[in-house]
From Swiss-Prot:
Gene Ontology CC: plasma membrane
Domain of life (superkingdom): Bacteria
Record-given protein name: Uncharacterized membrane protein YhfC
Membrane topology: Multi-pass membrane protein
């Protein structure tokens, strides 16, 4: 049986993923006059550059090309690749969209809106939708209907690890996904302001800074995936510290854009 606590924490994580981006853009619009158009440009940027383009490269490098697939088995190469690819695609995408589609939107509030849209769609796709599917699987396990989903070998291979996760993961860990999204959105807003500064002041060197900082933010998650960091809570503590620095920059950046 999947515990009630696990289901509750999954629901809370999903709620954070869906409601936080909406709450942020409503707040930013009411208090700072942020643009809904910029919010949706930020969301589109994540979808195109992270989900489609970066995702396509990952399929080729990690699955199709045998040489790179084998090379990525080494933790060092996988770590470097994973961290840098996210930074390159998302930050270059941010720069291009701001440069060509936000020519009249270079204010501090625009940076807030873009980051909320970018990080918001990321939260919905990564944590929100997965929380919903996991809750559905949890109810199926508890009602005894999960086995009916295992119609063939491929489905079993995909679903049995999910069943193991739901049954054996400590309940509190399901809440970490929602907490991580809070930190991630803060970082995405901070990076959006950094890239917008690069665009506004024609200082592309700050794009390089954003790529490196984005890569740094991804290091704890990659180390956890490879088993170098053993506890998920440790990852979230590190990520929260990075998010706190991002919030400090977000507040200070208001003067920079005046």
């Amino acid at each position: 049986m999947v515990s009630q606590e696990a289901v509750v924490f999954l629901a809370l994580s999903g709620a954070i993923a869906f409601l936080l981006p909406i709450g942020l853009i409503v707040w930013f619009k009411r208090k700072y006059g942020a643009s809904l158009k910029v919010f949706f440009i930020g969301a589109l940027t994540f979808f195109v550059f992270a989900q489609l383009l970066e995702g396509g490269v990952h399929v080729y490098v990690l699955q199709v090309n045998e040489m790179t697939k084998e090379a990525m088995q080494h933790p060092l190469w996988y770590g470097i690749y994973g961290c840098l690819m996210a930074g390159i695609f998302e930050e270059c995408g941010r720069y291009l969209m701001m440069r060509f589609f936000m020519k009249r939107h270079h204010t501090w509030a625009d940076g807030l809106a873009f980051g909320a849209g970018h990080g918001g769609l990321e939260a919905i796709l990564i944590t929100g939708l997965s929380s919903i599917s996991l809750i559905v699987y949890a109810f199926a396990i508890n009602s005894g209907t999960f086995e009916q989903l295992l119609v063939n070998g491929d489905v079993k291979q995909a679903l049995l690890p999910i069943q193991e996760q739901l049954l054996h993961t400590p309940s509190y860990e399901w809440m970490l996904g929602g907490i991580e999204r809070i930190s991630a959105i803060a970082v995405q807003i901070g990076l959006s302001l950094l890239v917008l500064y690069a665009v506004k002041n024609r200082r592309p060197l700050f794009l390089l800074y954003s790529i490196l900082l984005h890569a740094l933010f991804n290091v704890p998650a990659v180390l956890y995936q490879r088993g170098i960091i053993e506890h998920a809570a440790a990852v979230e503590i590190i990520v929260a510290l990075i998010a706190a620095l991002s919030v400090y920059w977000i507040v200070k950046a208001k003067r920079v854009f005046q």
